[in-house]
């Protein structure tokens, strides 16, 4: 591990033996820098511009070398605003790529793309840092066993299970529960797997980043009394940042996650919100560097950039990084090159439905639209596969019958269809679950439901053994035993009212 010259140095003196160049041209966030002959920096090296602007305010801008232009010039992309920079300013070549702090010191803190804390809680120990540019693990290091990553969330584990070390796409509009689902996953991986999480906010709203931080503190995911007990590190490069920062902030978050996997040998959850913004920032940088655009104006290196990020997210013999990536689909066009390139890397999709959220069924995961490559008998076993398929068939039949019910009512259905509808409504409600992180809102204690318990519960509903229980007994409970207990309580309450 190498000390990060951009975040740990006691000033320019730390770079005394480094290459010195000067700014030759400034085009927005792109700088052309001239260096002495024979002293050119490498691609991806971090350059630091230090000096004072026209009103004598200190300037400290870090850039990353993207192109060697010839004539002893390089073209670099700035990681922060270039306001106040002038031609002729001195530029220091740090001789290394951007490096960021890693390890336990990152938990409970918010960082920017450079690994600098931005939460006003003081400096971070930067003795252990890691460069953000690395190659993906070699084939021989990979753990190729197909294993399920149990989340404790019934609808996910049963119908669209996550792969350990896999990549999951999270699709959903505003206000359907993405944030709460993300926080519950962070909470559950810490409790059940002893793992940690890294959240990369890539090109999204600053307000949402702040709301997430506040909600994490409120729900205990971040312990502000003792930060080392927190379960998550946050890395933000929001909408207002230059494209260079938005393009690299995903790599900063990934580097922190890799340390937990490779050195601490933990299971890590890596959230990227939003993977589309990573592509969008790359497109902006590509245009600024003068590359010829490809389809729909995207960068010609789209697949390469996406692949270099996604291939580092994997399981090794030491631990795993399981990634959940929010995917924005521009104009709902799934054939757009950005989401289409993302889909090629995904093992599962979790689709959140506004219709279910409107019914009050949380998590509002759509059981029919969500998919997983893991849902195969040879991976999950015959019992799990059969149960999941029967649940989907029942819900699909209910969906087909809804138009008839809306026009003619339940009474016009056949006896068999009425039974299907009754069981489907129970299944729909049993797919809801009280979350630990939502205790403060709902007043119901959170429930972690193991996969075996989940399968047992749905098998009992499908077998007809619970046909006599009321629908509301299945709503917002953990395992199936709680359903029978709740049904007994409901019956006692109704008897008392009589």
From Swiss-Prot:
Gene3D superfamilies annotated for this entry? 2.40.10.170, Bovine Mitochondrial F1-atpase, Atp Synthase Beta Chain, Chain D, domain 3 (1.10.1140.10), P-loop containing nucleotide triphosphate hydrolases (3.40.50.300)
Q: Which SMART domains match?
A: AAA
Catalysed conversion reaction: ATP + H2O + 4 H(+)(in) = ADP + phosphate + 5 H(+)(out)
**Keyword set for this entry?**
ATP synthesis, ATP-binding, CF(1), Chloroplast, Hydrogen ion transport, Ion transport, Membrane, Nucleotide-binding, Plastid, Thylakoid, Translocase, Transport
State the EC number(s).
7.1.2.2
Q: Where does ATP bind?
A: 172-179
The yes or no answer to whether the keyword ATP-binding is present is yes
Where it mainly occurs, coarsely classed, is plastid
Looking up SUPFAM superfamilies in the UniProt record yields:
C-terminal domain of alpha and beta subunits of F1 ATP synthase, N-terminal domain of alpha and beta subunits of F1 ATP synthase, P-loop containing nucleoside triphosphate hydrolases
Which top EC class applies here? translocase
Cell compartment(s), UniProt: Plastid, Chloroplast thylakoid membrane
The Swiss-Prot or TrEMBL record annotates one GO molecular function as: ATP hydrolysis activity
Q: Which PROSITE patterns match?
A: ATPASE_ALPHA_BETA
| Any one Gene Ontology cellular component term annotated for this protein | chloroplast thylakoid membrane
Pfam families, alphabetically? ATP-synt_ab, ATP-synt_ab_N, ATP-synt_VA_C
- What's its membrane topology? Peripheral membrane protein
Subunit: F-type ATPases have 2 components, CF(1) - the catalytic core - and CF(0) - the membrane proton channel. CF(1) has five subunits: alpha(3), beta(3), gamma(1), delta(1), epsilon(1). CF(0) has four main subunits: a(1), b(1), b'(1) and c(9-12).
Task: Relate the protein's function as given in its record.
Answer: Produces ATP from ADP in the presence of a proton gradient across the membrane. The catalytic sites are hosted primarily by the beta subunits.
Homology family: Belongs to the ATPase alpha/beta chains family.
Q: Which HAMAP family match?
A: ATP_synth_beta_bact (MF_01347)
Q: What is this protein called?
A: ATP synthase subunit beta, chloroplastic
Source organism per UniProt: Citrus sinensis
């Amino acid at each position: 591990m190498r000390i990060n010259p951009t975040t740990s140095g006691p000033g320019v003196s730390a770079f005394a033996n480094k290459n010195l160049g000067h700014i030759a041209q400034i085009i927005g966030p792109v700088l052309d820098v001239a260096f002495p002959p024979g002293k050119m920096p490498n691609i991806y090296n971090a350059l630091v511009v230090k000096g004072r602007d026209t009103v004598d305010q200190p300037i400290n801008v870090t850039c990353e070398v993207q192109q060697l232009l010839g004539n002893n010039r390089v073209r670099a992309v700035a990681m922060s605003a270039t306001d106040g920079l002038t031609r002729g300013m001195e530029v220091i070549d740090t001789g290394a790529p951007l490096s960021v702090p890693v390890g336990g010191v990152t938990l409970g803190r918010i960082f920017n793309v450079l690994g600098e804390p931005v939460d006003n809680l003081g400096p971070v120990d930067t003795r252990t840092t890691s460069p953000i540019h690395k190659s993906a693990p070699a084939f021989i290091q990979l753990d190729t066993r197909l294993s399920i990553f149990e989340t404790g969330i019934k609808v996910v584990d049963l119908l669209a299970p996550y792969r350990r070390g896999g990549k999951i796409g999270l699709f959903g509009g505003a206000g359907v529960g993405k944030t709460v689902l993300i926080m519950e996953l962070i909470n559950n991986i810490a409790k059940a797997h002893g793992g940690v999480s890294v959240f990369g906010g890539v090109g999204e709203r600053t307000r949402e980043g702040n709301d997430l931080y506040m909600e994490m503190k409120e729900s205990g995911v971040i312990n502000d009394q003792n930060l080392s007990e927190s379960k998550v590190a946050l890395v933000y490069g929001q909408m207002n940042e230059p494209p260079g920062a938005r393009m690299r902030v995903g790599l900063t978050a990934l580097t922190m996650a890799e340390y937990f996997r490779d050195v601490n040998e933990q299971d890590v959850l890596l959230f990227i919100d939003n993977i589309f913004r990573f592509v969008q920032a790359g497109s902006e940088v590509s245009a600024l560097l003068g590359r010829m655009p490809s389809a729909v104006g995207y960068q010609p290196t789209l697949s390469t950039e996406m692949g270099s990020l996604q291939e580092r997210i994997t399981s090794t013999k030491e631990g795993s990084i399981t990634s959940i990536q929010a995917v924005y689909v521009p104009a709902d066009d799934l054939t757009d090159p950005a989401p289409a390139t993302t889909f090629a890397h995904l093992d599962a999709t979790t689709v959140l439905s506004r219709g279910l959220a409107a019914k009050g069924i949380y998590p509002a995961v759509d059981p029919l639209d969500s998919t997983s490559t893991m849902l195969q008998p040879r991976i999950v076993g015959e019992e799990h596969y059969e149960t999941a398929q029967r649940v989907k068939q029942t819900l699909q039949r209910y969906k087909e019958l809804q138009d008839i019910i809306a026009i003619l009512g339940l009474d016009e259905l056949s006896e068999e269809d009425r039974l299907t509808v009754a069981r489907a409504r129970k299944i729909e409600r049993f797919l809801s679950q009280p979350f630990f992180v939502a205790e403060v809102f709902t007043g119901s204690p959170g429930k972690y439901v193991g996969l075996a318990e989940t399968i047992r519960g749905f098998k009992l509903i499908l077998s007809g053994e619970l046909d006599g229980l009321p629908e509301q007994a299945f709503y917002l409970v953990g395992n199936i035993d709680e359903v029978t207990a709740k049904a007994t309580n409901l019956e006692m309450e109704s008897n008392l009212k009589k």
